[in-house]
């Protein structure tokens, strides 16, 4: 990035030939990943009057929360990480990525990509259980695959909703309770 914390500028470079749609998609994803699509001002307003927290704004002004590359990854990661340690959750995520994800390459460097719903089309409960998922987490993961794969859940649909509507929709999904819906 360029600019300053007060006036940040995000620079994105894409190698190779790309269509304008691909460039727009890549830019949107980078903005999502590095968190620049959100406005931190409401957060600053909440913590500004609390001395113990206002130091966060002073020390980390301009910092944005990073996000996963897709809503599917975000929600799946939230479900996988429930009621287990961060290390175990990261291990499950890694195993799912290694077994079902794709490999992207940039400048000769390979990157493991979290699977898309269609990458999990042949996965079944036993397959996911063999990776260490519990019965329920395997069921929930496949349920999310089906919801996203069928188009019932889309990022554009969620982006058009306010927070309360998103939370209501999330609570309809198996594996997501009030705490997870609010966290997401």
Could you describe each region identified by the protein language model?
Residues 1-184:
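HhH-family (HhH-GPD) DNA N-glycosylase catalytic core used in base-excision repair
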């Amino acid at each position: 990035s360029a600019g300053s914390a007060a006036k940040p500028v995000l620079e994105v470079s894409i190698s190779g030939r790309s269509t304008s749609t691909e460039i727009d998609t890549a830019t949107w994803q980078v903005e999502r990943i590095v968190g620049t699509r959100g406005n931190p001002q409401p957060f600053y307003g909440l913590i500004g009057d609390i001395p113990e927290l206002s130091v966060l704004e002073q020390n980390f002004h301009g910092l944005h929360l990073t996000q996963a590359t897709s809503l599917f990854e975000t929600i799946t990661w939230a479900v996988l990480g429930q009621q287990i340690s961060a290390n175990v959750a990261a291990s499950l995520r890694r195993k799912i990525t290694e077994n079902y994800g794709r490999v992207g390459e940039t400048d000769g460097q390979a990157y493991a990509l979290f699977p898309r719903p269609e990458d999990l089309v042949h996965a079944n409960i036993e397959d996911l259980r063999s990776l260490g998922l519990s019965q329920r987490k395997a069921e929930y993961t496949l349920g999310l695959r089906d919801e996203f794969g069928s188009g019932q859940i889309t990022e554009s649909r969620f982006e058009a909703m306010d927070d309360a509507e998103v939370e209501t929709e999330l609570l309809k999904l198996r594996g997501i309770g009030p705490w997870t819906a609010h966290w997401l």
